[in-house]
């Protein structure tokens, strides 16, 4: 591991995904709002939780000991689930954590390869956790870089060409059975985000005879009227009246048999329906992977863009460290300057000099002295941060000199020992 890569070790992730625990089990790992708030009280770290139908991923940043905070979360999960659920987590830190999130943002790790939806999900996640006060500037730059990498991958590769989103795949698989939707009776069960997207796509496909069913009739009505469709109260016994039904509704682990001739496209997690003539998310995943095999040559390009993104993240991180360092030092210098100017004003007043112009000259002169005196030092510090082999150790050592506290969990002992050793050998 290079010294630069060590800088990223303050970032870690705890992962539960459709690849590791299966799409049908993923709902067991979702965090409730109360559990998220409990984490805030438990750990000493910035954190954000990315929860989608494909994954539950916790990202952390701590400037002390991130792995210690990871272990706290895993123990917490074990306690609330009354079983060692944390043992099923995949834990990544440093460059590996960044690479994973960047691949997720690129759509290369999605159930539906190349999907665009994940970018908005990453954006809404970091925005929400920032608003809640659970994430800070270091996790912000981590997620912002992931979003930039995701956009760049889509611009420079063909990973997202064609219909790759999970909703598009669901529509296409249903169309294969009927050629088109023009004269088909279609049912959408649910009125949430997924159902809204399915309904919008059906409208774009020219579907005319569509009915929205939902437990809350008002939500079904609101969605249906938006597209000029019908709506009804949820009644599963009526499924046999339709040619195709798209299912997107929350349920408490129900499993129902498809006893009708209706084609059921069930994108619920876990699936509500089993049996013949049922298409689930797992089936759509298989189709997505087959589609991606035709674009496997894009993987090398994607991996290169991800590696470039990690180097850019390192730059972002160092820039944030430098900005924080400069802010701390300049705040201290400015406090000293202002105090000394006040002393000088008082001395001038003792001499009978109470000229406002003289005070302004004194203010400008001290600012100029500080700028000319410290600029070479600041230039050297910037060079150490962005180019130095032991950049983070030098930063902490300089801050120790100014007695202003550390901004990183990396110890300064190594650099101090090195300096002592060098003096001893003279």
From Swiss-Prot:
EC assignment: 1.2.1.70
Q: Does the keyword Iron apply?
A: no
Q: Which residues form the active site?
A: 53 (nucleophile)
The feature of type site (Important for activity) is located at 100
Its GO biological process annotations read: protoporphyrinogen IX biosynthetic process from glutamate
Oligomeric state and interaction partners are given as: Homodimer.
Q: What does this protein do?
A: Catalyzes the NADPH-dependent reduction of glutamyl-tRNA(Glu) to glutamate 1-semialdehyde (GSA).
UniProt lists the family membership as follows:
Belongs to the glutamyl-tRNA reductase family.
Spell out the protein name for this chain.
Answer: Glutamyl-tRNA reductase
Which gene carries the instructions for this protein?
hemA
């Amino acid at each position: 591991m290079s010294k630069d890569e060590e800088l990223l070790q303050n970032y870690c992730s705890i992962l539960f995904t459709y690849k590791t625990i299966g799409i049908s089990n993923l709902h067991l790992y979702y965090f409730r709002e109360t559990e998220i708030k409990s984490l805030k009280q438990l750990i000493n770290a910035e954190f954000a939780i990315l929860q989608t139908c494909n994954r539950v991923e916790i990202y952390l940043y701590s400037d002390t000991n991130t792995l210690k905070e990871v272990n706290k979360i895993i123990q917490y999960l074990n306690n609330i689930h009354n079983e060692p659920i944390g043992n099923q987590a995949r834990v990544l830190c440093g460059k590996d954590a960044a690479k994973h999130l960047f691949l997720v943002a690129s759509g290369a790790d999605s159930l539906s390869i190349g999907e665009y939806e994940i970018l908005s999900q990453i954006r809404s996640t970091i925005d929400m956790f920032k608003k809640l006060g659970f994430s800070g500037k270091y996790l912000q730059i981590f997620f912002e870089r992931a979003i930039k990498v995701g956009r760049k991958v889509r611009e420079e590769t063909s990973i997202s060409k064609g219909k790759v989103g999970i909703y598009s795949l669901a529509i296409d698989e249903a169309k294969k059975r009927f050629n088109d939707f023009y004269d088909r009776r279609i049912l959408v069960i649910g009125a949430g985000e997924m159902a809204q997207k399915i309904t919008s796509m059906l409208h774009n496909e020219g579907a005319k005879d569509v009915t929205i069913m939902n437990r809350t009739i008002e939500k079904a009505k609101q969605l249906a009227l938006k597209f000029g469709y019908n709506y009804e109260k949820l009644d599963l016994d009526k499924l046999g009246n339709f040619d195709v039904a798209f299912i997107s509704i929350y349920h408490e682990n129900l499993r129902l048999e498809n006893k009708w001739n209706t084609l059921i496209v069930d994108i619920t997690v876990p699936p509500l329906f089993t049996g013949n003539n049922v298409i689930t998310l797992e089936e759509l995943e298989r189709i997505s992977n087959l589609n991606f095999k035709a674009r496997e040559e894009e993987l090398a390009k994607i991996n290169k863009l991800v590696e470039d993104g990690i180097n850019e993240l390192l730059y972002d991180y160092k820039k944030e460290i430098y900005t924080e360092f400069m802010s701390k030092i300049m705040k201290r210098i400015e406090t000293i300057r202002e105090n000394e100017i006040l002393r000088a004003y008082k001395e001038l007043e003792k001499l009978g000099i109470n000229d406002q112009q003289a005070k302004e000259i004194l203010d400008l002169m001290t600012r100029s002295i500080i700028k000319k005196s410290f600029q070479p030092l600041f230039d050297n510090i910037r060079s150490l941060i962005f180019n130095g082999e032991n950049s983070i150790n030098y930063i902490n050592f300089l801050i120790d000199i100014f007695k202003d506290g550390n901004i990183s969990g990396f110890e300064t002992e190594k650099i101090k020992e090195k300096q002592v050793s060098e003096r001893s050998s003279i």
